[in-house]
Design a protein with these regions (language model features):
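N-terminal auxiliary segments of SAM/dcSAM-dependent transferases
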Residues: 1-76
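Helix-turn-helix-type domain boundary/helix-start signal
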Residues: 14, 46, 89-90, 247
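An acidic site on a long C-lobe helix of protein kinase domains
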Residues: 52, 92-95, 227
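Short helix-terminating capping/connector loops at secondary-structure junctions
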Residues: 18-21, 112-118, 241
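SAM-dependent Rossmann-like transferase core, predominantly class I methyltransferases
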Residues: 44, 57-140, 144-156, 172, ...
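Alpha-helical elements of Rossmann-like donor-binding domains used by nucleotide-donor carbohydrate transfer enzymes
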Residues: 7, 27, 55-58, 98, ...
Length: 288
């Protein structure tokens, strides 16, 4: 096992740092074939079947071509749970877990203020469903609805909800179009929309550029807040009194995003930093 690990690690070092290459090689053997780090360090002898050899060779070719390990394995970890992923969805990032934590805190505050209230939460642009599923599992009494424009993404999200036992309602919806929803029908809207300007693409890692869905990543250079304005407008029309809109953002546009929320009629816009000190989230509330 140690020789397989070493060979893969050495090949991956052409694309990644030594630490990243080691982590990916460990992940492939552990999550793909059930070979633990202990087995690797002990150089435990295990014969791969013909099928396992074929799968391993295919995985190695995909990894060496720069495909993210999460797509190669078909899964990624988020908030302590394993989610299925494919090139139809973004790979969940640890920073987004902080948005989920904030949403849970706000939802619990809304529930405490009105214990009889049946909370309705929307995850706009759900992708893999990691936000919606995590919220439903943390807030089992809430109704959670997840939107996405991509049917491929919705299929992955539905699979994750079913696997993890989260009763989430999924809808194919373009958040840029008029929402056509009743006033005061949603208590909390959470979103991690596309926010990377096309001009930033040249600074991004090539495995992200080549493999993750561009429609879920990028916005035009001349209109970086297009999704945030749509979210703010829709939220102002549909949030209940004291309901909230919470979003992940491009750290270059924190104050502009907060201003867009206020201009749409929301109040008390707040910028929150992530664990690395970057402006990562903006939230605002509906008026009384």
């Amino acid at each position: 096992m140690n020789s397989l690990f070493t060979a893969l690690r050495m090949q991956l070092q052409a694309l990644y740092t030594e630490g990243e290459a080691r982590a990916i090689a460990f992940m492939v053997l552990d999550e793909g074939f059930g070979v633990s780090r202990t087995d690797i360090y002990a150089d435990k002898v295990r014969q791969f079947s013909e099928d396992e050899h074929q799968r391993y060779d295919i995985m190695c070719k995909r990894l060496i071509a720069g495909e993210p390990v999460q797509y190669v394995l078909g899964k990624a970890w988020f908030a302590g749970r394993q989610f299925a992923v494919s090139p139809d969805v973004l790979i969940p990032r640890p920073e987004t877990e902080e948005l989920v934590d904030w949403a849970i805190e706000v939802a619990q505050g809304l529930q405490k203020a009105n214990p009889q209230k049946h909370l309705r939460i929307v995850d706009a642009g759900t992708g893999s469903g990691c936000i919606a599923v995590s919220l439903k599992l943390a807030l089992p009494k809430a109704e959670v609805v997840a939107w996405d424009i991509s049917e491929g993404a919705l299929n992955i999200a539905r699979k994750n909800a079913q696997t993890l036992g989260a009763e989430v309602k999924f809808e194919q919806r373009d958040m840029l179009q008029p929402w056509a929803l009743p006033a005061e029908s949603i208590d909390l809207i959470v979103s991690n929309p596309p926010y990377i300007c096309m001009r930033e693409a040249e600074d991004m890692e090539q495995n992200v550029m080549k493999h993750e869905p561009h429609t879920a990543l990028f916005v035009p250079n001349d209109d970086p807040l297009r999704f945030y304005r749509a979210l703010a407008k829709g939220s102002a029309q549909t949030l209940t009194k004291n309901g909230a809109l919470l979003t992940e953002i491009n750290r270059a546009f924190g104050h502009e995003t907060a201003e867009a929320f206020m201009q749409a009629g929301l109040k008390d816009a707040e910028i929150k930093r992530d664990v690395f000190g970057n402006e990562r989230m903006v939230g605002a509330f509906a008026g009384l």
